[in-house]
Structure formats: C-alpha cells, structure tokens
Amino acid sequence: DVIKAALDAEMGLLKNMGVNVIRQYTGVQPKWIQYIYENYGIYTMLNHSFGRYGLTVNGGWVAVTDYRDPATQELLMSEATALANDYKDTPGLLMFLLGNENNYGLFWAGAETEDFPDDEEKRAFIGEQRGRPMYKLMNDATIKMKSIDSSHPIAICNGDVLFIDIIAEECKDIDIFGTNMYRGASFTDAFKTVKEKLDIPIMLTEFGADAFNAIENAEDQKMQAYYMVENWKDIYQNAAGLGKAENAIGGFTFQFSDGWWKFGQTKNLDIHDNNASWANGGYSLDLAPGENNMNEEWFGICAKGPTNTRGLYTLYPRAAYYALKTAHQLNPYEEGVTPEF
C-alpha cells in the first residue's frame, strides 16, 4: 500500500525528532489519522481551508470566496457540520483548525505568496467589507461544530494578526488563535498583542525559514537552523508559567519537506526552483536591498530525493531537523524550567 509506505517513512522521521502533532488537511481519511496515532504516537490537527482557495458554489467555480454570499455561507456551514460529524470519534484527532490565512485570501487568490498591499485604508476597507463576514461565519461554524463535538478544541488560522480587532468582536467562541507568522528570528510583540486583544491561547500554525540563501544563491542550512531555533525559543519563553505572555501553546514548523510545487503552482513541478517570490526584512541574513529573499520551494527541514516508480521519494534531513530534535526535548511546563533555559 503506497499510502502506508509513505506514512511509515515520514512518520518515523517525525517521531525521531520528537514531533507530537502534525497539521493535516481535510481529505485525509479517519483511518490514517488513527494509524499515525496508534503506530507513532503523533496526533493530528485537522484543517478545513474554509474557502481559502476558492469554492464550487451551485455548480460554478468561484476563485475568490465571497463570505457575504448566502449560498457560500450555506455551503461552508454544511461542510463544517460534516467535518465534526465525520471525525469527532477519530482516535488521534487533537483539534480542528478552520482556514489558512484566509484574511490574506481577501487580497489575492491562490496559494502563492505575494507582497502585501501597503495602503492602510484599503486594508481597513477590505477588512470591514469582506473580512468581518468571513470571521463571523468562522465563529458560526465553530458554534455548530461544538454542538456536535465538545471534546476537541477549535482554532482559526489567521495571517499574522491582521484584523485582530475584528476577530475580537466576531470570533468569541473559538478556543485558540492560530496564526501563520513570518517575522524572522522573533515573533516580536505577537504574544502580548494576542493576550491583550483576545486573551486566549496563541498557536503558531505556520512559521519557519527557507534553506536557500538569496544573496549567495546557494543552500544555507545553518541560516535556516538559526531561525528555527530562535523561533522555538520565543514560543517556549511565552508558555504558561514562565513569566512573559504565558499564552503560547506550541507551533507547527513550516515545513517538513520542500514543496517543489510552490512557485508557479502548475508548472515545472519536477524542478526545485530557487526563485525568491517575496521580500521579508525579518530574515535579514540573506536580504539584499530591493531584492526578494523568501524562497518558497526551500522551506523544508528535509530535502527531497528523486521520485521512484511508486511516486515515493527519500527525505534527507537538513541541519534544522537535528536542531529541532534537540529543541523539542524541552518541556516548558516541567518544574524548575526558567526563561533562561
């Protein structure tokens, strides 16, 4: 069985580095969530994209989801209801996650990351007109899912903290604020902001760094490992009991293996592209003035080998894998642990 072969190879590597939960999207059958848990002790956070990449509404494809549309609302509520019913009794399910930085999807379509619009008025207008209905619908879905399954927490996945004031007003029933966040070595004031605005736990649903140095135009494993370790240090220091924001409950490192599909999405899928798609000043080690430095296809803490006839490939851990293996051994809740760990 090709699925079992793929899982056994990857879950073994994940277990070895101390991973205790992975993020999977809907479409994975409950039996595989159970298989991963029973054989490797790894839980699943199950993620419904909630229209992030478009929807088929009344038989027609809609590329950019309009959360104000009644038919769209009905469709997403029915999918959320089915999600809770289908997975509520699955061994190994840890929690549900709704969306994937859907607030960014209000500005651009598709999964390919772009630079963000600078116009504050435009952002605020889109937040009110299109974002507020989306967040309200996410909260409605949360209420419905909790009426079916009261055993699993429900989080949303936001892009950074954009529109957090609207979230505070519209998402009063979510359990956890999930965020995809790329700020460099530190998450700066994120934990404090979430504590002040929402006062619920924060979970990093995506964070990390690529392993390609845009200045040197070459792989740079040390650079990637540095950002990974610094990010985890920040998460740990904001865990409960350590005297800072005390609201961080963990995170999902992005990503386990390189995504060769990320640049271009539908072309050159057999090429490991080194194009830098966007610029981020937080990652200063390979930032040149006026140049992009975020290499979407190089975020894996494992590199991919060639694909065999079964469609499988060998993974080759990078330095970040081993750095994270050490970092994962720390339990911030253990007696005697201090912020200076």
Which residue stretches match the model-derived regions?
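Aromatic-rich peripheral "rim/lid" segments of glycoside hydrolase catalytic domains that contact
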Residues: 254-341
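Active-site clefts of carbohydrate-active enzymes
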Residues: 55-65, 107-117, 198-238, 248-267
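Amphipathic alpha-helical segments in well-structured domains
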Residues: 73-80, 138, 191, 221-232, ...
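A structural motif corresponding to the C-terminal end of an alpha-helix
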Residues: 16-18, 86-92, 140-152, 234-248, ...
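Short, glycine-/Ser/Thr-/acidic-enriched flexible segments
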Residues: 183-184, 209
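Active-site mouth of glycoside hydrolases
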Residues: 1-177, 186-187, 195-198
